[in-house]
């Protein structure tokens, strides 16, 4: 029976391809790629000759229907992305969901993942972590997401485009406060590096593919609770958080009833 193979590919070093991934890519009829031109560098290097189909976030449903039909017609299909595992901050989840709903077999061929590699190489100590991928561009959405995880005691991991690096660090500091941060750059590539700094003095270089690990909240006192409730609320409102979210956050940080904080918010 034909299948969809979800195949992990190298995140920088072509030698990180697995034997099973190569065997799979050489055996399938079709390979769905995020960017066919980008994937050709890997596929040509290993003499993979399957037919390529462009599958990306702008054609996931339309192309996905065609790919599922090809599998139902007896052709084996693999999906890869530009780097790492499909469906993790990359296209793939929609196609896998369509296959599951239609009873089409799905098999994973695991490979490198940038956020897991970053945790391993950074030196951050943790028993768990939260992975958020890329933050949205819109300020309101970004604030809403960050505010949900500001009190997390485990590290929070982000993917960051180089041109957004300093802005993202500033946005995170506005909601999280000052934290230690690990900037993992160009993982498995020639200029691989880890910069350990803090959000308040952040000055990491804006180049390369970046994974940012922000340490979780410690048990130390929150300096914001030394402010008045009014100033505490203003801190979050000025960062772009809406009143409801700010009230919830301040109430949680001060261990106060939300209604009490809300009454203060009404006076601002």
Positions of predicted regions on the chain:
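A contiguous loop/helix-start segment that scaffolds small-molecule binding in enzyme catalytic cores
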Residues: 155, 159-268
